[in-house]
Structures are given as C-alpha cells and as structure tokens.
UniProtKB/Swiss-Prot annotation:
<keyword id="KW-1133">Transmembrane helix</keyword>
<feature type="topological domain" description="Extracellular">
    <location>
        <begin position="268"/>
        <end position="281"/>
    </location>
</feature>
<keyword id="KW-1003">Cell membrane</keyword>
<feature type="transmembrane region" description="Helical; Name=5">
    <location>
        <begin position="206"/>
        <end position="226"/>
    </location>
</feature>
<feature type="topological domain" description="Cytoplasmic">
    <location>
        <begin position="227"/>
        <end position="246"/>
    </location>
</feature>
<feature type="topological domain" description="Cytoplasmic">
    <location>
        <begin position="303"/>
        <end position="322"/>
    </location>
</feature>
<dbReference type="GO" id="GO:0005886">
    <property type="term" value="C:plasma membrane"/>
</dbReference>
<dbReference type="Pfam" id="PF13853">
    <property type="entry name" value="7tm_4"/>
</dbReference>
<feature type="transmembrane region" description="Helical; Name=3">
    <location>
        <begin position="109"/>
        <end position="129"/>
    </location>
</feature>
<keyword id="KW-0297">G-protein coupled receptor</keyword>
<comment type="similarity">
    <text>Belongs to the G-protein coupled receptor 1 family.</text>
</comment>
<keyword id="KW-0812">Transmembrane</keyword>
<dbReference type="GO" id="GO:0004930">
    <property type="term" value="F:G protein-coupled receptor activity"/>
</dbReference>
<keyword id="KW-0325">Glycoprotein</keyword>
<feature type="transmembrane region" description="Helical; Name=2">
    <location>
        <begin position="64"/>
        <end position="84"/>
    </location>
</feature>
<keyword id="KW-0716">Sensory transduction</keyword>
<feature type="transmembrane region" description="Helical; Name=6">
    <location>
        <begin position="247"/>
        <end position="267"/>
    </location>
</feature>
Amino acid sequence: MNHMSASLKISNSSKFQVSEFILLGFPGIHSWQHWLSLPLALLYLSALAANTLILIIIWQNPSLQQPMYIFLGILCMVDMGLATTIIPKILAIFWFDAKVISLPECFAQIYAIHFFVGMESGILLCMAFDRYVAICHPLRYPSIVTSSLILKATLFMVLRNGLFVTPVPVLAAQRDYCSKNEIEHCLCSNLGVTSLACDDRRPNSICQLVLAWLGMGSDLSLIILSYILILYSVLRLNSAEAAAKALSTCSSHLTLILFFYTIVVVISVTHLTEMKATLIPVLLNVLHNIIPPSLNPTVYALQTKELRAAFQKVLFALTKEIRS
C-alpha cells in the first residue's frame, strides 16, 4: 500500500496519474521468488563468464578471427547486453524488494530489451548469410564476406534496430496511466505496461506487431531462404562425406535459431490468447532473455571443433596455473 500511495498523483482532472510502476514478480509464486533468484543469478554469472571467455579466445587466436567467429563475438556482446538489461533488476526485486521502477527507467528498459532482441535476430541472419556464402559460393567467400562487409552489416543492424525500436517506448510513454500501477511481471514489457493504460492501447499493440514482422519476421524469412539454398547446394554434392561436413558447420547456428525463434513464437501466441498476466508467458519472457546468452557459448564450444580446441587449451592452461 505504501508503494501504491507513493506512486500515484492526483491531477487537475481528479484522476490518479501514475509516476512509477511496481513490478510484482512472477504471478502466483511470490513466496518462491527467493529460491528462483538463485538459478537466475547463476545463469547470469555463467552468461557473463562464458561470453567474455569466448570474446577473449577469439581475440587472442588469429586462427579464429574469421567472419563466422567475428559474428559470434558480436552475438556474445549482444547477449551480455540483453542479460544485463533485465537480470540485475529482477535480482533486486527478489533480494531487496526493490519493486518500484520509475516511468523513464521502465521505458528505457522496454527500449533496451527490444533493441537487443532485434540485434540478436539480426546477427543470426548475418551468420546465416555467412554460412550460405561459405557453402554455396566457397571460392568467392573471401572476396564476399570481408571485414568491410561485417562492419557494414553490424552498423546496419544497430541503426535498423535503433530506429525500429524507438516508436515502441515513445508510444508507451504517450499513454494515460491512471489508478493502476502494479505489473504482474519481473520486467517492463511493452504489452504488460500498456495494459495498465486508461486510454486506447491498440496503437501500441499494432505498432509492436508491425515492427516485429518487419524486423524479426523478415530476418527469419531470409534465414529460412538461406538454409533452403544451402540444403539445395548440399544435396547436389556427389560426396556424402562432403555433404555431412558442410551441414555440420551449420549445426550450432541452427540450434540457436530454433531455440530463439521457437520461444518468440510461443510468447507471441500467449499474447494473442490474452495470457499476459499468467505465470507461463511471464516465465517464458524472462527465460527468452537469459537462456540464449547462457546457451550460445556452450552450443558453439561443444559443436565447433576449432572453438572447442581453444576452450580446452584455455582450461588446460588454467588448470596448470592452479596446480603450480
């Protein structure tokens, strides 16, 4: 009640105007949140450690400074940004009861989440293009996927997502929030926040849907097209061994794509079926922002021979240092 009274102001029109939101955490299991914070904290620390280690390994090994691993390094930075955008605040809610978040902070978090998720989708598309050129046009690969192209593609994704995401928090900030300010969530999601608005929130829902289709929808379509062309090229190879080797270079990337976009689709379905305030979609939303940053380095380390060898070398050096 203290949070509620402190975060509502009376305007000249005698309406209660919200000045801050209260994030209640996972719906229906508030008493378990201290226990849930432990795996979340471990996932966050493992995400930071694993992604940082990947970056160091790529930086220190000239043999790994190839387009595929450079894109992986960029993905690692995006993953750390995404995890850091949400997990520290969630842990503050669970450990210190820091449930209050100001409107500017909330809208900034909405922007950051959408930006990093869009960047992840964009980098996955860049990695799909890299695999397409490597398998379908191997002789032209060095002249096509150059350092200049990688830089331009990355800058394009930054600009694209920066522009695409801007309308989402801007429209959310223009809504009239009155009376209710408690959100059954661990983070500021656009649809969760705008569901508290007193005025028409359809522009926000339409905007998010359109931008999602223009951004991640187009990324996924191009990724699918890339893999159709890759599969067509592989099936034309005379050697089964060569075909298997070509497809093996895509296994890590395909694993990330399937996990990332499957959860995106499930979350979208839960929003369309009006399940926004129940435990499952809230939990999925949080996991979608923390599992990929933790999973991506592990997938590549286990499935990529060069990176696995570099990991083993680092672990051997660390073990030797500890024993000495």
